[in-house]
């Protein structure tokens, strides 16, 4: 699941960046066993330690288009990299212009990095 759902630390960072906790479709919840936290689909309210964002949750908050300062609209592209090792790349634009380029082996980390780039560069999330 670590490649499909954010960790508690990743979730907290995404919330700091502006991703609303209610966009997470899962939560980390305390159990009756001391020191044990489990991941589960949202239900009920008790014992929630942190939200857990899935790949689908993060894809939903990425804008499909962004506009740069020059007024040019760039469309979101996500694809497998053409490098020798398996990886993913994400950017807005086309073959000539690529804005917000991210490249990671983990698809989850790719989405997390893209959200961070958007927020730190003044772009709005799809909320």
Sequence positions of predicted segments:
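Glycine-rich anion-binding surface patch
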Residues: 1-127
């Amino acid at each position: 699941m670590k490649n499909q759902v954010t960790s508690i630390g990743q979730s907290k960072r995404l919330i700091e960046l502006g991703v609303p906790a209610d966009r997470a479709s899962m939560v980390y919840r305390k159990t009756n066993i001391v020191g044990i936290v489990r991941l589960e689909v949202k239900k009920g309210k008790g014992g929630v330690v942190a939200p857990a964002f899935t790949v689908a949750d993060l894809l939903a908050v990425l804008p499909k288009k962004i506009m740069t300062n020059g007024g040019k609209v760039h469309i979101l592209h996500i694809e497998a990299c053409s490098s020798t090792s398996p990886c993913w790349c994400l950017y807005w634009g086309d073959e000539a212009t690529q804005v917000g380029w991210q490249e990671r082996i983990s698809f989850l980390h790719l989405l997390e990095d893209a959200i961070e780039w958007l927020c730190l560069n003044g772009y709005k999330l799809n909320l």
